[in-house]
């Protein structure tokens, strides 16, 4: 099998679409976290420790998502620059994209777990 370690135009175009999708998804997740946080604050809590813990988890998830969003944006900008300057040998861009893919996957898992915990807590607090 012949491995190509070049960021050809097709690969760069794919990565740009991938990054755009990630940025959109993270933005949607952050908007939903804002909404869930609002619901969390609007209900009466029997145990403030649970609410406080969930608020801390929301804050952490929001910070992690913001950092990931920034990293994706930097990669996106780099790929556009590579494309515009016809750089096809930016091996680091390939590695960075793979690392970002793993970070996005982990971030999504944490988000889903937090979302489920929040939905459960909110639904039992009425």
Regions found by a protein language model. Give the residues of each.
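Charge-rich amphipathic alpha-helical interaction elements
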Residues: 1-126
């Amino acid at each position: 099998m012949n491995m190509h370690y070049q960021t050809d135009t097709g690969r760069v175009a794919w990565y740009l679409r991938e990054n755009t999708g990630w940025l959109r998804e993270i933005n949607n997740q952050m908007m939903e976290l804002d909404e869930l946080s609002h619901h969390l604050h609007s209900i009466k809590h029997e145990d403030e420790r649970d609410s406080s813990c969930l608020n801390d988890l929301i804050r952490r998830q929001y910070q992690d998502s913001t950092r990931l969003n920034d990293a994706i944006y930097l990669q996106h900008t780099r790929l556009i620059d590579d494309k515009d300057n016809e750089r096809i040998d930016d091996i680091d861009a390939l590695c960075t994209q793979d690392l970002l893919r793993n970070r996005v996957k982990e971030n999504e898992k944490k988000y889903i777990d937090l979302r489920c915990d929040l939905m459960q807590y909110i639904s039992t607090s009425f």
